[in-house]
Swiss-Prot record:
The gene is sec61a. The SEC61 channel-forming translocon complex consists of channel-forming core components SEC61A1, SEC61B and SEC61G and different auxiliary components such as SEC62 and SEC63. The SEC61 channel associates with the multi-pass translocon (MPT) complex. Residues 54-76, 139-144, 194-240, 310-354, 442-445 are lumenal. This is Protein transport protein Sec61 subunit alpha. Component of SEC61 channel-forming translocon complex that mediates transport of signal peptide-containing precursor polypeptides across the endoplasmic reticulum (ER). Forms a ribosome receptor and a gated pore in the ER membrane, both functions required for cotranslational translocation of nascent polypeptides. May cooperate with auxiliary protein SEC62, SEC63 and HSPA5/BiP to enable post-translational transport of small presecretory proteins.
């Protein structure tokens, strides 16, 4: 059934816009240039407002997810990377459940990627329609059908641009992937802004700066009681404080420390005697993929819950899925879940919230750990990184594990890879929960993504440098 399904969508994949693979080896400096151009286009789209919207000042239901999904309210990047990640999530679950069978052949892999892109475009249209019809940009009946259609077209074109930018980097023209680049940029921008933002906010304590570091110096300069000023800068509520900043730096350090954990399996050449090497299996074997897929799952649940609560407010089943409330204090207007499934799957706002509602905290911990371990375990099967795939790669390179025959390599790799994937996903979920409970800026998930992505770019840079020999040769 799986192969038939991929064959059915083959004609549709043929008409999709596609980036051709490079016909020659792309130099590192060219990759840097293409990566910079891709990032520039993304940042420009983040600043171009959608034409025709009446208002985007209402409470934002996706405020907590925007950092992770690289989206910006009221702009062309309203949907961010959500459609790409959601399509990846759906295809992964279908392949993991064996509803779709993906073979080891390049043809099947290409069809699978094409199907993912096709679903991404369909989801872009679906999400755009939901955003417009639920009144995120004003009452649809007041805007008129023409304006509603225009907004949907803008969001679709922007979604297509994101798909192609991601594919451009994935095909080898740039460094890493578009998804990783956009997420890391958005998260780092948020952390820097929350630390140094000069924006003033009127609170019950008077006018304060949003940025934690600027607020620290402002409070010390304007308050006569310096001890109280320090206490306020470290512990103030509803705005970024110094403790949040310290927690962020601490989580950064912990994640970087865990990145170094790995098991090196000894391998040797089957052709040349005396040629030995190691095959590293990292603790974070699937990197940040589990947390990205988990974020996509939650964000789509939020979309469905918001849409239903807007249309069927008061319905028992809708309330069971999620009840929402608006918050306007200490920053932009935002909607947050206060009851239902969405509430229990959202992180507690602070350690105090954990103590106030331990059941919420417990359910959130179980969900994060379980979903990350599950996504990590299933991802290796569809991404070509399972024990069988690794054994095949080693065989093609004429490498074997020391002390094992070719036939027993899969069995030996199976002792390590699925365990590393599941335990690594569990650790990623645990670190994300810890960061959320500590109140780190940008959310635990966001920081985890930023660190793992930056570390990936560091590894790419080191690899390219070792191949080129020097920094000068690398860039010039």
């Amino acid at each position: 059934m799986g192969i038939k399904f991929l064959e059915v969508i083959k004609p549709f994949c043929a008409v999709l816009p596609e980036i051709q693979k490079p016909e020659r080896k792309i130099q590192f400096r060219e990759k840097v240039l293409w990566t910079a151009i891709t990032l520039f286009i993304f940042l420009v789209c983040c600043q171009i407002p959608l034409f025709g919207i009446m208002s985007s000042d209402s409470a934002d239901p996706f405020y907590w997810m925007r950092v992770i999904l690289a989206s910006n309210r009221g702009t062309l990047m309203e949907l961010g990377i959500s459609p790409i990640v959601t399509s990846g999530l759906i295809m992964q679950l279908l392949a993991g459940a064996k509803i779709i069978e993906v073979g080891d052949t390049p043809k099947d892999r290409a069809l699978f990627n094409g199907a993912q892109k096709l679903f991404g475009m369909i989801i872009t249209i679906g999400q755009a329609i939901v955003y417009v019809m639920t009144g995120m940009y004003g009452d649809p009946s007041e805007m008129g059908a023409g304006i509603c259609l225009l907004i949907i077209i803008q969001l679709f074109v922007a979604g297509l641009i994101v798909l192609l930018l991601d594919e451009l980097l994935q095909k080898g023209y740039g460094l890493g992937s578009g998804i990783s680049l956009f997420i890391a940029t958005n998260i780092c921008e948020t952390i820097v802004w929350k630390a140094f933002s000069p924006t003033t906010v009127n609170t019950g304590r008077g006018t304060e700066f949003e940025g934690a570091i600027i607020a620290l110096f402002h409070l010390l300069a304007t308050r006569t009681d310096k001890v109280r000023a320090l206490r306020e800068a470290f512990y103030r509520q509803n705005l970024p404080n110094i403790l949040n900043l310290i927690a962020t730096v601490f989580v950064f350090a912990v994640v970087i420390y865990f990145q170094g954990f790995r098991v090196d399996l000894p391998i040797k050449s089957a052709r040349y005697r005396g040629q030995y090497n190691t095959y590293p299996i990292k603790l974070f074997y699937t990197s940040n993929i589990p947390i990205i897929l988990q974020s996509a799952l939650v964000s789509n649940l939020y979309v469905i819950s918001q849409m239903l609560s807007t249309r069927f407010s008061g319905n028992f089943l809708v309330n069971l899925l999620g009840t929402w409330s608006d918050a306007t204090s200490g920053g932009p207007a935002r909607a947050y879940p206060v009851a239902g499934l969405c509430y229990y799957l959202s992180p507690p706002e602070s350690f105090g919230s954990v103590l106030d509602d331990p059941v919420h905290a417990a359910i959130y911990i179980v969900f994060m750990l379980g979903s990350c371990a599950f996504f990590s375990k299933t991802w290796i099967e569809v991404s070509g990184s399972s024990a069988k795939d690794v054994a095949k790669q080693l065989k093609e390179q004429q490498m074997v594990m020391r002390g094992h025959r070719e036939t027993s390599m899969v069995h030996e790799l199976n002792r390590y890879i699925p365990t590393a994937a599941a335990f690594g996903g569990l650790c990623i979920g645990g670190l994300s929960v810890m960061a959320d409970f500590l109140g780190a800026i940008g959310s635990g998930t966001g920081i985890l993504l930023a660190v793992t992505i930056i570390y990936q770019y560091f590894e790419i840079f080191v690899k390219e440098q070792s191949e080129m020999g020097s920094m000068g040769a690398l860039l010039f």
